[in-house]
């Protein structure tokens, strides 16, 4: 008996679906932030800052951010206080961080106040996720992106998103803990799928005859789990830095998830291959697509042609942009607090990356869990700083032999046994012997 459907984070290209709803006398309001196609759906209202001639000044709202704006306008029109709406700003912050949209403008303001609420008065469902995940430190953008967001998303990836809705709506600790336990189990399954499929995908790339020359990656396996192929695409880019599309069988068709490298417009590239697709949608750095199985090879060839003709060579090389050459003796609590004021950090407002040169370990270097690097580093005239590098165990032998090296890193606050200290989060290491003399 529904008379109105409101879409959130989708619908901008769903022309036929909205037409079908119309035929049943159902109105549609679309809240989306993806790029529209040439034809807009015949909805009674379309809220999308990326549609042509949209006067709204800020174009980078998340999908939930657009929905938040609809509710904000509704409060204004109906004379309701917006205080009730802003009670949900913690959920808006989670959406902004999880959607990987720029942390600029309104997004930065919403994220700042949303994170404040997450830390000061988390709702039962969020507190339950914090508890079940073992998260100890204050919540920030990274906590949302890597701990809270993936668990909420895991419900829909592995089973059904209703489980996440139940969690976020839970009004007491007991219900929240039960829902969080279920969602955490889904996340463990998601991780297993992620690791297995990523391993298979990387092996396929390694065995490809074009592994060293290709400008793109398009992989297909009919039994890959659709819920993790976007994550797998991102993992592949970490190893092979080029636009990547992972495809799998879904409902008799082939569905895909695409991810890009910095500054390359993936959406435009896919659009040029749209004659081989049933449908697609997304934005510059991420997209989804559907095609017939018979078109996979033709799509792979055409997509590679499009990318190789439009991507710059430097975009295929992972780069780390250094913000400041920083001697270790200039790092202090005061300096860290000044840096922290620039947050919340995220896309287009990334945490400053520093480089300190000619450093060495104090002899306590060790490997954690067979893959992570834990150091205590110093320069000749500095105190010693704790540093950690995820997945950087390959540097251990040379560091252990006291070879001096340059290190680029971000700063973070580490808490152990109730004591807070500044820790260096390593982004990359270059040994002094390996320096390029031209740099």
Language-model-detected regions and their locations in the chain:
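Hydrophobic helix-and-loop "lid/oligomerization" segment in the mid-to-C-terminal part
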Residues: 1-4, 9, 24-25, 75-298, ...
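Conserved acidic residues
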Residues: 3, 44, 406
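Short, ordered loop/turn segments at secondary-structure junctions
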Residues: 10-11, 33-36, 45, 50-52, ...
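Intrinsically disordered, low-complexity regulatory tails of plant transcription factors
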Residues: 14-15, 99
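Short Gly/Thr/Asp-enriched flexible loops that form oxyanion-binding sites at enzyme active sites
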Residues: 15-24, 33-34, 41, 230-233
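Acidic-glycine-rich active-site phosphate/pyrophosphate-binding loop
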Residues: 38-48, 377-383
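Short alpha-helices
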Residues: 41-80, 85-97
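Mid-to-C-terminal polyanion-binding domains and interfaces
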Residues: 175-179, 185-219, 272-439
